[in-house]
């Protein structure tokens, strides 16, 4: 049976972070350009493609469960194949294929450019060579400034160009991008860079995502225009480390210039920057974020802990006082700015005193959102081989205590906003009008319920007064109501 005899339907499941969502939209564009039709119901798809997450243990378990659930559809008379792509597939490759025979193929990032061809081979009954993992840091030059010229030889998801795509996916004229929107909301992630040059002891991401590689400003701006043409009002700039943007393009302050260029995109209302490294958060970048009209005052800061000695053990920089100085610097200029971060507890060598330092920092920092994660060993990381591993039950107890503390603190921070004014982007109108304020990132930072807001549409930005809170979520009414 040839591919011409097939339905050529595919269902794509995107797991994990916003960076993976961008990769999924690239895959969707390439599959559609290759003759496949995307369907919302997996039971109607001949092929189910799962864009997996390989970051932490729970994410890997969720990815495996999703692949197994997709494989269960094979008896429905329509679904014939299940394909694993994404970070878990890239990271484990053959090992994943051997442990999960229910998947018909495990493909790596190098397969993305011809993903449609790979799927046609599977439909025709052919077999594909299972991806063999390699350290992707070795694919680009060690020197960052030498990487742009080598970029064309390496497959980097989210860095694709569009000349090979049909007009049904991206137009012959106007802004072009190698992506097909899978959502309809007014906000969309926009990848500004990939990979990471840091060597955090707990993190395996650089091994399978590779060395840091920035996208040129013109390419990002073009994609932003394309997103606006497809209904987007807010772009959420994503990468593994946004504050390093431009290091490989010869300009360590290129992020400031990118924000100014994006500010000129007609129809774009909000620009949001994610995942900033505190050690690289320079005063000029803070100034640009706070002074550029469309850039929302939002700081996603990767603290990870607050104990200086433990951060050194993590191969990171900073301590509670230096982090508080950053926060004070931001809030002295913009008291309403949103600040969020994530923290790891239970890292090898963490003591009760370290936990006390972190708890004290959280109380003094008054973050809008704080996530607390229990440390777990990741294969191939320095931390997995360290001494001083903390007993699992102790790690669990520490995480629960810190999570309870952060829940209380972020609720208090939300209460502090009652009586103040802000702006809210409307995202959903159903039984209630739901949106997000400038200090709230997509999906993870809570929402705002708008009351007395009858004449609004999705994508509208409304001046509001905050009148109530429920945990991290807020209630607001139009300021002129």
Curated annotation (Swiss-Prot):
State its Enzyme Commission number(s).
Answer: 2.8.4.4
A molecular function (GO) term: 4 iron, 4 sulfur cluster binding
Q: Which residues bind [4Fe-4S] cluster 2?
A: 196, 200, 203
Keyword annotations for this protein, in alphabetical order, are: 4Fe-4S, Cytoplasm, Iron, Iron-sulfur, Metal-binding, S-adenosyl-L-methionine, Transferase
The residues the record assigns to binding [4Fe-4S] cluster 1 are: 17, 53, 87
Where does it live in the cell?
Cytoplasm
Q: Residue limits of the TRAM domain?
A: 415-480
> Can you quote the record's cofactor note?
Binds 2 [4Fe-4S] clusters. One cluster is coordinated with 3 cysteines and an exchangeable S-adenosyl-L-methionine.
Domain (Radical SAM core) spans 182-413
Q: Which reaction does it catalyse?
A: L-aspartate(89)-[ribosomal protein uS12]-hydrogen + (sulfur carrier)-SH + AH2 + 2 S-adenosyl-L-methionine = 3-methylsulfanyl-L-aspartate(89)-[ribosomal protein uS12]-hydrogen + (sulfur carrier)-H + 5'-deoxyadenosine + L-methionine + A + S-adenosyl-L-homocysteine + 2 H(+)
**What GO cellular component entries does it have?**
cytosol
**Would the keyword 4Fe-4S turn up in this protein's UniProt record?**
yes
HAMAP family listed in its UniProt record: MTTase_RimO
Task: Please report the name of this protein according to its UniProt entry.
Answer: Ribosomal protein uS12 methylthiotransferase RimO
Instruction: Name the gene behind this protein.
Output: rimO
């Amino acid at each position: 049976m040839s591919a011409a005899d097939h339905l050529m339907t595919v269902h794509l499941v995107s797991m994990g972070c916003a960076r993976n969502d961008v990769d999924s939209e690239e895959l969707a564009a390439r599959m559609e350009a290759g003759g496949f039709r995307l369907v919302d119901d997996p039971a109607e798809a001949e092929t189910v493609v799962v864009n997996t997450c390989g970051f932490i243990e729970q994410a890997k378990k969720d990815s495996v469960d999703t692949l197994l659930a997709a494989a269960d559809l094979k008896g429905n008379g329509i679904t014939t194949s299940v394909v694993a792509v994404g970070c878990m597939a890239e990271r484990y490759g053959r090992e994943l294929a051997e442990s999960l025979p229910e998947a018909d193929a495990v493909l790596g990032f190098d397969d993305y450019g011809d993903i449609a061809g790979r799927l046609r081979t599977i439909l025709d009954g052919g077999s594909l060579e299972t991806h063999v993992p390699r350290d992707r840091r070795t694919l680009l030059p060690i020197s960052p400034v030498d990487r742009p010229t080598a970029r064309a030889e390496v497959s980097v998801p989210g860095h694709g160009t569009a000349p090979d795509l049909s007009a049904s996916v991206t137009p012959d004229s106007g802004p072009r991008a190698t992506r097909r929107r899978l959502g309809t909301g007014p906000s969309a992630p926009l990848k500004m860079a990939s990979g990471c040059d840091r060597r955090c002891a707990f993190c395996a991401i650089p091994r399978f995502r590779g060395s840091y590689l920035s996208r040129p400003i013109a390419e990002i701006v073009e994609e932003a225009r394309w997103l606006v043409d497809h209904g987007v009002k807010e772009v959420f700039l994503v990468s593994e480390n946004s504050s390093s943007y431009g290091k490989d393009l010869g300009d360590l302050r290129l992020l400031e210039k990118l924000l100014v260029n994006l500010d000129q995109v007609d129809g774009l209302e909000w620009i949001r920057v994610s995942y900033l490294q505190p050690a690289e958060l320079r005063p000029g970048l803070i100034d640009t974020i706070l002074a550029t009209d469309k850039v929302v005052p939002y700081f996603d800061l990767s603290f990870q802990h607050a104990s200086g000695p433990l951060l050194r053990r993590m191969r990171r920089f900073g301590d509670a006082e230096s982090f508080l100085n950053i926060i004070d610097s931001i809030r002295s200029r913009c008291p309403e700015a949103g600040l969020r971060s994530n923290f790891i507890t239970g890292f090898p060598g963490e003591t009760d005193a370290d936990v006390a330092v972190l708890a004290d920092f959280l109380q003094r920092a008054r973050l809008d959102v704080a996530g607390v994660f229990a440390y777990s060993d990741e294969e191939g990381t320095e931390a997995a081989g360290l001494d001083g591993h903390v007993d699992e039950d102790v790690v669990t107890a520490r995480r629960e205590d810190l999570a309870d503390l952060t829940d209380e603190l972020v609720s208090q921070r939300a209460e502090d906003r009652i009586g103040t004014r802000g702006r809210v982007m409307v995202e959903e109108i159903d039984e209630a009008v739901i949106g997000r304020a400038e200090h709230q990132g997509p999906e993870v930072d809570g929402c705002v319920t708008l009351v007395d807001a009858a004449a609004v549409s999705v994508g509208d930005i409304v001046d509001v007064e905050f009148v109530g809170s429920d945990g991290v979520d807020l209630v607001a009414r139009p300021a002129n109501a």
